[in-house]
């Protein structure tokens, strides 16, 4: 009997403690809600200044273990406020330290709150609710820690709608998000299996297996830097006169800052490009940017954002201001000796792979106190080194030319007969200006510039002679490469 009494007493004490703690965290949530809404509205104004939307809280009802609240997104534009249209979300909040919804899932880690949110069937969303047969098209479950960090899982319901000539098929999607309390660290993961939009007369667009991941951190200058990745397994566009299939499209980026200088690497790839069933090949692009002054970039971005509306209304005046801004910030931008490289950009088909590499090293303009040169001269002075290398196997170029001819209506035999002539014609035209070389079945090109001297495929000349060669429609040559002495 004593043991039973002790057990009941312990349960009662724990229950009272849980109730008290839940009531207290509910009170904390209510206090922080206004701050959360104010911060959200500030973010909306900062990142979407022309959207004219505002978030508010309505019908907050606080209980001991749970609370309910209605978040409403209003449109501030009177012309858009028709019949009181608004987007609203109904949120159920389970109070910590052990939110009931988390306990039922055997998650016993303490948290301030657990939230379940669904969209409300308002006039603005009625059409969308009709497609989901009255269910909320988007739901979310969120966990908030005591320091304010947020973890959310957002589910988008599948859609299957057909009306007249149109058809929409969507498999649904899932988004997971981890956001720090100060909004500086954000990790996102988005996945969807299938999206198809079809029109009986216009064709269709199909997306298969889309994955998007992002892990970024906000810097003191408000740059969101980190890693991002996008992959689309298949993208198909079908129309009356086209059938394009892109397979294995990827895009990845990695950005960081060091000593107020920005660095980034951007990789793009396509596993296969097929048009009307013809496999045109695969390609990739790898781009690197290093040592870019963050403050100079921010000044340009801030000005551009502020003048975005003027850019549409007063294009010429704003363009002049942009040019002045670039000229003013160029010395700072070049102070870190920024670099840009492409290594490589390539395209590969069944007959070979063409590659292009590019390197640009920039330098500080003039010593302090020197009279600034005009913008065009500054651009020339800013280039410390510029290099480019091109390699195209003739067989690969011929195959590509034949495929393009077939896409334009030529038969296979006609395309294969025309392709070598087309390639040789283009090569001959480029060789007139010494832009390419042709040796051992390879079309190549090499360009190097430094110290006002250009070397193009072994021919050395001044920058002025190089530019004048194109302006005067004459071959670009000034000095032939040195020949080794011959022994007799």
Q: Which residues make up each language-model segment?
A:
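Positively charged n-region of N-terminal signal peptides that target proteins for export
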Residues: 1-5
